[in-house]
């Protein structure tokens, strides 16, 4: 009985739904595990909501790929074998855990990128823009009129698709053999042309 009780209080990996994003600026979300533990007598025990769970997304200390997270999104929870309270508080070097707990529900991390199969982002019909499974794609606002994307084609081409496209910077350099403009060209300020001369914009 004691071993069974101890196992009941240990967690390893569970899907969950996001129930709170008020601490998203800190890289944490509130989640509710969605699969309970079924016992031989037919009863089920559902874990409680877990607050302030750190998000796992591609990042280093100085670079990151940042995704918006909303209530209703799904995540995959993994649970540390040791108490991560000190680590969450900023301890980056080797240290002793603050408690003796093992695989505890309070030591969860939330991995983004888990969805039911019927909500797969690989499904072309879920995309407003044309989609190929052979391409590498960064997409936002999936399936809406505001869908935009950066697409690395299997052919070696690159496509940017958006309602409006803006470069912000002090300079922009294009080292290409040819630039083809399929629409109107509006210049605000001065445009210097190779071969001499300035063209004044509006």
Language-model segments: which ranges?
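Intrinsic-disorder/coil detector with helix-boundary
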Residues: 153-202
